[in-house]
């Protein structure tokens, strides 16, 4: 059985944050010392290197699962299918739902379950689970959806990637200007004569690399 992406959807938040919004930030070096350059110079260099002049942040009342729900609605509409026809909802993220003003991630119930609830899916056989896999989480979700379909365990999967990184970055880190919020989703279906994933390669490096990324201390 071949597969096809039959629908896609995204949600781009409305809150526009230009580079000039960072001019009053107190950026620090990794040792806690203040940069010698002015924020104006730092921001100009940042734009020259990255090409980024603005980014989008989620509204205060929305969390990652809300953005994912909006993107999923668009994907289902694009695919012209009912949410009740889904066999799996695979939601790739890293930090869960982080409420505005907090840095604490909330992952219970799973964000995929929250999306299923928002979509008002009654079918208990629609399995919803989260995938924490770093930056390539959505790609790994696609690989898993492909495996489910090829094995005959599923015919239709909803694969989502969403994050509200604006709520977990260090405000004193100049690299915080890189990150933004948003969501993307797609419907993957079994389809005769469609396509295949020709190759894929996943890996986890967990020796000295295991704690390159970590949560900071709580106070």
Write out the residue ranges for each language-model feature.
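Short acidic, glycine/serine/threonine-rich loops at helix termini
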Residues: 16-17, 101-103, 142-143, 168-173
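Condensing-enzyme catalytic core mediating Claisen C-C bond formation in acyl metabolism
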Residues: 1-61, 173, 178-219
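Conserved catalytic cysteine-centered active-site region
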Residues: 39-65, 98-156
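Acidic, glycine-rich active-site loops and adjacent beta-strand->loop/helix elements
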Residues: 92-98, 132-137, 161-166, 203-205
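Buried hydrophobic packing segments
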Residues: 68-75, 141-148, 188
């Amino acid at each position: 059985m071949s597969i096809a992406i039959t629908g896609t959807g995204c949600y781009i938040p409305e809150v526009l944050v230009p580079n000039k919004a960072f001019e009053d930030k107190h950026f620090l070096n990794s040792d806690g010392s203040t940069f010698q350059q002015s924020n104006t110079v730092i921001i100009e260099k940042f734009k020259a290197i990255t090409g980024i002049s603005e980014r989008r942040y989620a509204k205060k009342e929305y969390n990652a699962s809300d953005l994912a729900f909006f993107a999923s609605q668009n994907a289902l509409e694009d695919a012209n299918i009912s949410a009740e026809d889904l066999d799996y909802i695979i939601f790739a993220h890293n930090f869960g739902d982080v409420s505005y003003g907090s840095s604490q991630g909330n992952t219970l119930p799973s964000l995929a379950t929250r999306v299923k609830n928002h979509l008002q899916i009654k079918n208990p056989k629609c399995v919803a689970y989260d995938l924490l896999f770093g930056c390539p989480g959505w790609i790994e979700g696609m690989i898993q959806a492909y495996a489910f379909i090829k094995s005959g365990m599923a015919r239709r999967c909803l694969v989502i990637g969403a994050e509200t990184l604006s709520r977990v970055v260090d405000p004193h880190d100049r690299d915080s200007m890189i990150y933004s919020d948003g969501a993307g989703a797609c419907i993957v279906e079994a389809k005769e004569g469609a396509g295949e994933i020709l190759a894929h390669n996943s890996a986890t490096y967990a020796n000295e690399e295991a704690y390159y990324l970590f949560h900071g201390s709580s106070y």
